[in-house]
Every structure is written in structure tokens, then in C-alpha cells.
């Protein structure tokens, strides 16, 4: 994709006599008079945009500048949104943390995970606490278990200086399960078994006439 600065010259703002012209499909048209290039742009209902003013002669391109700027702005917006969603947040815990503080901090982690961010959970050790890394691991396990419904650890905890770190990543949304195809009530599926034939009706009993 071509990158065009917002302050580049367009159409009548271009004052040079000749330009090297690129067509709307990226084809090289060559060096032509600027007036002719502008006429070509008008005939195609496009704009003449100077994309490389430092070249000799300057390079111009035929394009719909308004549409191009809109697409550029949308791309920039999407890139900013993607960058924000990929940002790694950070929440710090102490080894000696009370239940209320733990609940508050895991609530922050949960919110970040729900927003699509990864979160670096850090356990900060003080003094002799560093000689008991199992205390930090215990808190990280508790964090992971508390947030198991929205995230999961990426790899194992790692020590860096006086801190123990663990990355929590948001869980991917679960794909919907496919339900079994509904069948009409009473439909037992395809069967080749024929229904049994009805039994023949019994002949009616007759009483014998008494002999004379």
C-alpha cells in the first residue's frame, strides 16, 4: 500500500511543469506535462497526487484521494486498536497480601483479561522473603486458579531480580458446540424393518345342531 503524507500537494496545488506519472493501477505512464496529467485525472474522475516531491521530476499518481485518505484513517484506527489490545498490563502483589487486597488486584487482572490484554502478574519480595520463593509461587497459583475462567498462565513463573513474574493470557472464546440435529418427535431414524403383518382373524365358532 502507498503511504501518502497529509500535507502533500493535490491537483491544482502541483506547480511543476512535468511529473513522472503512475496510473491508478500502479502502471508506469512516464514523464508527461503536469497539465496533461491533470486532464487525465479529470477524465477518470480521479485526483493527481504528488507522492514523491523530492524526485526529479516529482512523482505523481492518479487516485481517488478522498477515498484513499478515508481508508488510511481506518487503517490507522485499526492499528491503534490492535496495538492497545496487544498491550501487556502489569499488576503487582506482595508476598504478605491480605484477602481484600488480593480480591481487588485479581479484579483488575480479570478486567484486563476480559478486555483482551495479557497481564504480567508480579510478586515483589522484600529482604529475606526472597529465600522463600515458594511463597510467591503459592500466590501465583492462587491467582491462576481464581482467574481460570477468563485466562491461563503462559509458561512457568520466572525470577527477575527481587520479583517473580507470570504472564496471564486471555482465554480464546469457546467455539459453539454443534447440537445434534433435531428430529421429529417419534422419529426413530432410518430402519428397513417392516411392520409385522397382522395375524389372520380366527374363524367364528359354530354350534352343531342337535340330532333328532
UniProtKB/Swiss-Prot annotation:
- Which processes are annotated in GO (biological process)? ribosome disassembly
Q: Where is the composition biased (Basic and acidic residues)?
A: 176-186
Record-linked SUPFAM superfamilies: Translation initiation factor IF3, C-terminal domain, Translation initiation factor IF3, N-terminal domain
Keywords of the record, alphabetical order, are: Cytoplasm, Initiation factor, Protein biosynthesis
Question: Keyword Ribosomal protein on this protein?
Answer: no
UniProt GO molecular function = ribosome binding; translation initiation factor activity
**One GO term of the cellular component aspect?**
cytosol
Residue ranges the record marks as coiled coil: none
Q: Where in the cell is it found?
A: Cytoplasm
Query: Where along the chain is composition biased (Low complexity)?
Result: 194-212
Top-level lineage group: Bacteria
Q: Where is this region: Disordered?
A: 168-212
Protein family: Belongs to the IF-3 family.
> PANTHER family under this entry?
TRANSLATION INITIATION FACTOR IF-3, TRANSLATION INITIATION FACTOR IF-3, MITOCHONDRIAL
Show the HAMAP family listed in the entry.
IF_3
- Which function does this protein serve? IF-3 binds to the 30S ribosomal subunit and shifts the equilibrium between 70S ribosomes and their 50S and 30S subunits in favor of the free subunits, thus enhancing the availability of 30S subunits on which protein synthesis initiation begins.
Q: How does it assemble?
A: Monomer.
Tell me what this protein is called: Translation initiation factor IF-3
Q: What organism, scientifically named, is this protein from?
A: Deinococcus radiodurans (strain ATCC 13939 / DSM 20539 / JCM 16871 / CCUG 27074 / LMG 4051 / NBRC 15346 / NCIMB 9279 / VKM B-1422 / R1)
Gene (UniProt): infC
Amino acid at each position: 500500500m502507498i503511504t501518502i503524507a497529509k500535507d502533500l500537494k493535490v491537483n491544482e496545488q502541483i506547480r511543476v511543469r512535468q511529473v513522472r506519472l503512475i496510473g491508478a493501477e500502479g502502471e508506469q505512464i512516464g514523464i508527461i506535462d503536469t497539465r496533461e496529467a491533470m486532464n487525465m485525472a479529470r477524465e477518470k474522475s480521479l485526483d493527481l497526487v504528488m507522492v514523491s516531491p523530492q524526485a526529479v521530476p516529482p512523482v505523481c499518481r492518479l487516485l481517488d484521494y478522498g477515498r484513499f485518505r478515508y481508508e488510511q484513517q481506518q487503517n490507522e484506527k485499526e492499528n491503534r486498536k490492535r496495538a492497545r489490545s496487544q498491550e501487556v498490563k502489569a499488576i503487582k502483589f506482595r508476598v504478605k497480601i491480605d484477602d481484600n487486597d488480593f480480591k481487588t488486584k485479581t479484579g483488575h487482572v480479570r478486567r484486563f483479561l476480559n478486555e483482551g490484554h495479557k497481564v504480567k502478574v508480579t510478586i515483589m519480595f522484600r529482604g529475606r522473603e526472597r529465600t522463600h520463593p515458594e511463597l510467591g509461587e503459592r500466590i501465583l497459583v492462587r491467582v491462576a486458579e481464581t482467574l481460570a475462567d477468563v485466562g491461563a498462565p503462559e509458561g512457568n513463573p520466572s525470577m527477575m531480580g527481587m520479583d517473580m513474574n507470570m504472564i496471564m493470557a486471555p482465554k480464546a472464546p469457546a467455539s459453539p458446540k454443534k447440537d445434534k440435529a433435531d428430529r421429529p418427535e417419534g422419529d426413530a431414524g432410518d430402519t428397513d424393518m417392516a411392520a409385522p403383518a397382522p395375524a389372520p382373524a380366527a374363524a367364528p365358532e359354530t354350534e352343531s345342531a342337535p340330532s333328532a
